Amino acid sequence: MTQAITVEESRELDDKTINKIGIPSLVLMERAGLKIYENMLDNKDLDLSNVLILAGTGNNGGDGLVVARLLATHGYQVSILTVGNPDHASEDHLAQARICNYYQIPKVFMNADFNKFTTLVDALFGSGLSRNVGGDFATIIDKANASTAKIHAIDIPSGLNGDTGDVMGTAIKAISTSTVAYPKVGMLKDQAKPYTGKIYVDDIGIYRGNAFENE
């Protein structure tokens, strides 16, 4: 079985890769987006004829925006729904949003009919979720699960606890998930399996050694 890591170990690997080794976070985001795009092409259970990216305002959402651009530039029909406070958006998310604006990728809003889309990409939360999902995020997750579209999740299905695999109020039910370097331990728990679907583990250049080695 593929080795799994905790959420804290994942944070430490990210920190070492970006701040000690020196690979820029935006480079990692581009690599992640390309791998996710390739995973989606690989999964023949996904119909990519009309895709909606559900993007939070953090770096998980930024990964989703890279996927949106790659789909658009390869001729796929794709739209973006951004959920969350734009005033709290990460710098890398804002950079990807500007690129999507350049390519004039359509935006939709909370009242969009999800049933008209064939695939939804869950880029709402990463693995660091520590409290129950509420508000607009819970509304979007429940709406996505109730739709006829199939869902591909980025990093971990939004609403799952990365360490325990427990549902934090509500969670995306994906048919496939792209995660980087290692899966989180919670993703391999029995209770998480109905939510993760097929798991793709992608190498994007994250440091894969011992996160706790002596410097």
Swiss-Prot record:
It comes from the Bacteria. Keywords: Isomerase, Metal-binding, NAD, NADP, Nucleotide-binding, Potassium. It catalyses: (6R)-NADHX = (6S)-NADHX; (6R)-NADPHX = (6S)-NADPHX. (6S)-NADPHX binds at N59, N60, G61, G62, D63, G126, S127, G128, L129, S130, R131, N132, D155. PROSITE patterns: YJEF_N. Belongs to the NnrE/AIBP family. PANTHER family: NAD(P)H-HYDRATE EPIMERASE. This is NAD(P)H-hydrate epimerase. The lineage of its organism: Bacteria, Bacillati, Bacillota, Bacilli, Lactobacillales.
